[in-house]
Amino acid sequence: MSESTTGPCHDSLKAYVREIPDYPKPGILFYDITTLIKEPVGLARTIDGITEHFLNKNIDLVVGMEARGFIFGPAVAYRLNAGFIPIRKPRKLPGETVKHTYKLEYGEDTLEIHKDAIQKAQRVLVVDDLLATGGTAVAATELVKQLGGEICGIAFVIELDFLNGRERLKDYDVYSLLHYDK
């Protein structure tokens, strides 16, 4: 089911993304979205691009992962007339939570969501800024499913195609605005 949609309209957004070599460590090329979101046109076209893909999916809730999913998720939720649910690092949410621990290259990480955030069968869109290896997105989908939500799609601003994160999400409608192959 995983699909890839990018067109000239979206590719032009790359002009707003700053490339920083050797960050956060030597050999890494970092794609900085702060230059994208500081420009009203860049931010608007990003939100519009994600929203347009999911307009007819009857989304009830948008879930965004800490931290940059919080930038795009609420705006997408507003445009889709949906609610917004944050997924956070451990001990950042005040109420009762459920958690999912997942493996990283060197260690593990955990994400949490409020236990009452999603009702059974609610239609959920997961939004984040970047798809790299897919670990964070998989953890988010597991949390949504654990609460009984139905995942209607996963949206990213940027996808690093060379890391093959999409493979881990092949059961979902994955939509990325911008693709980078290096």
UniProtKB/Swiss-Prot annotation:
Top enzyme category: transferase
Pfam family, one: Pribosyltran
BP term (GO), one: adenine salvage
Recorded catalytic activity of this chain's protein: AMP + diphosphate = 5-phospho-alpha-D-ribose 1-diphosphate + adenine
Annotated metabolic or biological route of this protein: Purine metabolism; AMP biosynthesis via salvage pathway; AMP from adenine: step 1/1
HAMAP family (UniProt xref): Aden_phosphoribosyltr (MF_00004)
Protein name (Swiss-Prot/TrEMBL): Adenine phosphoribosyltransferase
Source taxonomy: Bacteria, Pseudomonadati, Acidobacteriota, Terriglobia, Terriglobales
